[in-house]
């Protein structure tokens, strides 16, 4: 259905133009009830902001974690030194944890389709829409970024050619120079159509849609549908209705219900039945119509038409049937009915994919609140490139890989009850930094529990210093690093030495004694600079003993 593409990510679909934004997940499922209410209202505001002249599509894409890309971005590279054995062991632990998890990466997109006369008008419209979406997603705590043509085509390529993700390559200029079609880069080798499933290059796919809605749907419905550990894609098509048209439609329906009730009462009166009670179904229609009109006119709700579709992918027909039964069973548990599209699998697939088309017309009229129940947010994933392993996500069971270099403040505390693993976490972090970075690491270890780890890493990069009374290591109070004291380091060091002597001598240091210490300190550093040596407190004592004043030897 895609006719033309532009490098900035705009697709021409039929006579319309579409653009896609990718938004990050937020911690909705693990939030408190109060926080969920705030997020729900913010998401409702986002839905209300959708333009009535456009069609929006919210897509949740479950794709298998690409092992090659994962290893390249997460695992430690070997460096050919004695510590490679520890790197191999660390990589083995990470791969084991990744295999034990669900191995599914969930991505979320918002696609907007709008009819415009030309690409210039469409580009201006999408620029305005993108700015508004960024504000609303920021209020939710989510990040929204627009996708260019390469990124949008990569989504389609990874879906059509599962298992060949690393082979994707698209260069628009090279394509035009060679006269190739962009479809050649993403389409499967063949498509085999059946009444209730498709075969895309050896992979079995089946498209379903939400046929019947429950009276009450929990906000975890979409998350539970997409929680299956399989490649799948779920989309919610949203068609906002203009407010004046929506109010007029509901008023006409309410007028029709009132007319039916009046006609029924007239017939009862003609039969001399003046005490007849209005039938329950008519009373319910009147009540629901009034509530709907109330939502539109007093509660800032909007009328929207929505359709939920999803496509399942599997390696075999048997696995596809089993996954389909699981989805159908899950929807029945929620008092909803998912159904398989018959002889509409291709139309359903084009509806699910985030390209901006809609071929399935199984609409349900909803208010903003009713549509917001299909909450796409689940839990935030932290998988930074080059990140440190901090554990597993309690909801998705995926790895938590955080690169603190990306944070505004890289400082951290390790807090926990006794026995919860604080020391182990610190050792794990230090070991990662030693093995994978060139960082300088200083460890203050009063308990002496980190020394074996430093010694195991090798004496060429680590040293254990024992600072204690009677110990073999000393701290040189006279040592100065480059840049010490800024303008006059000797004066600053002299003041430090005098304060040190004052702490040692309980009687205090007089003015003449301070003058002697100041003079000796300057002379000592001058001699050390000439001899290329480092002064010590012992050298300062010898210098003081050489002075003619009696106070110098006190």
Describe the predicted segments one by one.
Residues 11, 19, 26, 33-35, ...:
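Glycine-rich phosphate-binding loop of nucleotide-binding enzymes
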Residues 281, 285-293, 301-302, 318-322, ...:
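Non-catalytic, charge-rich alpha-helical accessory subdomains
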């Amino acid at each position: 259905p895609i006719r033309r593409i532009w490098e900035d990510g705009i697709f021409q679909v039929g006579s319309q133009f579409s653009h896609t934004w990718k938004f990050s997940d937020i911690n909705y499922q693990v939030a408190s009830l109060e926080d969920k209410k705030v997020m729900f209202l913010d998401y409702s505001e986002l839905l209300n902001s959708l333009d009535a002249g456009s069609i929006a599509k919210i897509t949740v894409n479950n794709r298998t974690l690409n092992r090659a890309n994962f290893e390249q971005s997460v695992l430690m590279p070997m460096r050919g030194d004695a510590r490679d054995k520890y790197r191999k062991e660390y990589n083995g632990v990470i791969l084991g944890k990744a295999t034990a998890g669900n191995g599914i990466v969930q991505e979320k997109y918002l696609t907007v389709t709008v009819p415009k006369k030309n690409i210039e008008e469409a580009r201006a419209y999408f620029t305005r829409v993108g700015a508004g979406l960024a504000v609303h997603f920021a209020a939710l705590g989510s990040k929204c970024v627009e996708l260019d043509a390469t990124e949008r085509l990569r989504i389609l390529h990874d879906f059509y050619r599962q298992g060949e993700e690393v082979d994707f390559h698209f260069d628009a200029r090279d394509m035009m120079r060679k006269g190739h079609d962009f479809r050649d880069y993403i389409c499967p080798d063949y498509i085999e159509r059946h009444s209730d499933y498709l075969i895309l290059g050896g992979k079995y796919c089946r498209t379903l849609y939400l046929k019947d809605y429950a009276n009450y749907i929990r906000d975890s419905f979409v998350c539970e549908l997409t929680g299956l550990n399989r490649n799948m894609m779920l989309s919610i098509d949203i068609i906002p209705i203009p407010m004046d048209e929506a109010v007029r439609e509901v008023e006409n329906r309410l007028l029709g219900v009132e007319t039916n009730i009046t006609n029924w009462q007239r017939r009862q009166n003609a039969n001399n039945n003046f005490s007849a009670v209005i039938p329950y179904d008519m009373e319910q229609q009147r009540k629901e119509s009034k509530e709907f009109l109330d939502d539109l006119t007093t509660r800032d709700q909007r009328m929207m038409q929505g359709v939920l579709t999803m496509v399942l992918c599997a390696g075999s027909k048997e696995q596809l049937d089993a996954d389909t039964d699981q989805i159908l069973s899950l929807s029945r548990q929620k008092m909803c009915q998912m159904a398989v599209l018959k002889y509409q699998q291709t139309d359903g697939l084009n509806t699910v994919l985030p390209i901006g088309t809609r071929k399935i017309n199984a609409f349900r009229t909803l208010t903003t609140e009713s549509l917001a129940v299909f909450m796409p947010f689940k839990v935030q994933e932290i998988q930074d490139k080059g990140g440190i392993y901090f554990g597993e996500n309690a909801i998705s069971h995926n790895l938590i890989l955080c690169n603190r270099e990306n944070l505004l403040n890289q400082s951290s505390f390790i807090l926990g009850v006794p026995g919860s693993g604080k020391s182990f976490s610190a050792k794990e972090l230090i070991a990662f930094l030693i093995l994978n970075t060139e960082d300088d690491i200083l460890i203050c270890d009063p308990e002496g529990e980190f020394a074996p780890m430093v010694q195991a890493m090798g004496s060429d990069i680590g040293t254990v210093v024992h600072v204690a009374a009677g110990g073999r290591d000393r701290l040189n109070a006279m040592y100065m690093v480059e840049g010490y004291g800024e303008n006059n380091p000797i004066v600053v060091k002299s003041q430090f030495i005098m304060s040190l002597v004052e702490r040692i001598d309980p009687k205090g240091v007089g003015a003449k004694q301070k003058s002697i210490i100041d003079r000796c300190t300057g002379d000592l550093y001058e001699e050390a600079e000439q001899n290329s040596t480092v002064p010590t407190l012992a050298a300062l004592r010898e210098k003081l003993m050489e002075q003619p004043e009696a106070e110098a030897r006190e």
